[in-house]
Amino acid sequence: MRVTSATCALLLALICSVQLGDACLDIDKLLANVVFDVSQDLLKEELARYNPSPLTEESFLNVQQCFANVSVTERFAHSVVIKKILQSNDCIEAAF
């Protein structure tokens, strides 16, 4: 089954929605890592930083699988969606 970029956007929005403080706004860094296909270890480390609870192997694999199934073009396209989410009032208010 192919995962759509919308699904990836929702996953990142979910990660963002559970964040406090700077982590919500810093998700741009995570997004850049995903777009440019960094190593699994680095991606896992970055995801762990944004997750207030220990990142489970299952949750990491879900996110990793999501991004493994979309093209670089799609990753850039949904990055715009995530940036809009990050700039929304809900996300900004969570940072304060």
UniProtKB/Swiss-Prot annotation:
UniProt xrefs under PROSITE patterns: SCGB (PS51311)
Keywords tagged on the record: Secreted, Signal
Pfam family, one: Uteroglobin
Annotated InterPro entries: Secretoglobin, Secretoglobin_Domain_sf, Secretoglobin_sf
Chief localization: secreted
Signal peptide: 1-23
GO cellular component terms attached to this protein's record: extracellular region
Subcellular location: Secreted
The keyword Secreted is assigned to this record: yes
Family to which this protein belongs: Belongs to the secretoglobin family.
Protein name: Secretoglobin family 2B member 2
